[in-house]
């Protein structure tokens, strides 16, 4: 009898331990690392704006206990405790003090490896996502759905994004080079920074049906001479405006218009086809991360091929995504200039 009672006691004691073991989930993050994280974590610190946005969109923002200052979409996230300006300079001591179940950071050097090691030494798991393209956004949505127990909502969100994404690829996937306009992409708030074929900027241009004039340059983010740009004579110019270049959470039309005029007025640029035809566009760098990346892709497609995408209204899609997932009204939000309206019927 005593033996049976002892076995029952041991079994009861083991149940919580076994349950704890079951409350783990293996995730392959954007860097391809297999990380074991808690299932259904109650406390998350986000150093990745796109991840914070998707967690909010899944209705689970209460789990987020702190964010970096660049996690500002939607702005409601800024009500969380600030843990630093960005993942590169996050307050590690405070993170360790808060002892979250999970930290989600950016990829590569944007969150130093030694910083991650300090957290994992304290038993805090770290996932990494930067989400500069749809092919990173959709897997992360699915990952967060699994982690948070919101797989159905995550699947619906991923399907929404995939539907818009496929509507682009179906039209541009087999497009011959002669039908693709040449594009110069001004990266990260610099006139002379761009991206070669290994960059996400190149992928965005190619998938939208364009030709990146910097595709064959040697470095991933080459710094080029403006004379070279003039000689290449791109048909379209797209400039990525950084958050340091405007005052609010998103830029104003006036701020983007001023930047566009600055580009058009660069010495010698009056001879470039993109300037002569008015195909110079400004985007907010925040459009290249999170759910807004899908709207950015639609804008690119519409800018490069207005006739092919005349049935698509990128701003309307952007508004639908903001309203449906972030409870935001697009009315006063402008992250591209000029817009790409749908052609009127008749």
Which residue ranges define each predicted feature?
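Secretory targeting signatures
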Residues: 1-21
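Alpha-helical, coiled-coil/dimerization segments enriched in small aliphatic residues
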Residues: 70-72, 194-220
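A local structural motif
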Residues: 35-40, 75-82, 207-218
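Short helix-initiation/N-cap motifs at beta->coil->alpha
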Residues: 30-32, 81-93, 132, 217-226
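Extracytoplasmic substrate-binding proteins
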Residues: 23-27, 34-36, 43, 113-193, ...
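A short, structured surface patch at a secondary-structure boundary
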Residues: 43-98, 102-110
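Short helices/loops that flank or line small-molecule/ion binding pockets
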Residues: 91-99, 122, 224-233
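Flexible, solvent-exposed loop/hinge segments that line or gate ligand/substrate-binding clefts
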Residues: 233-279
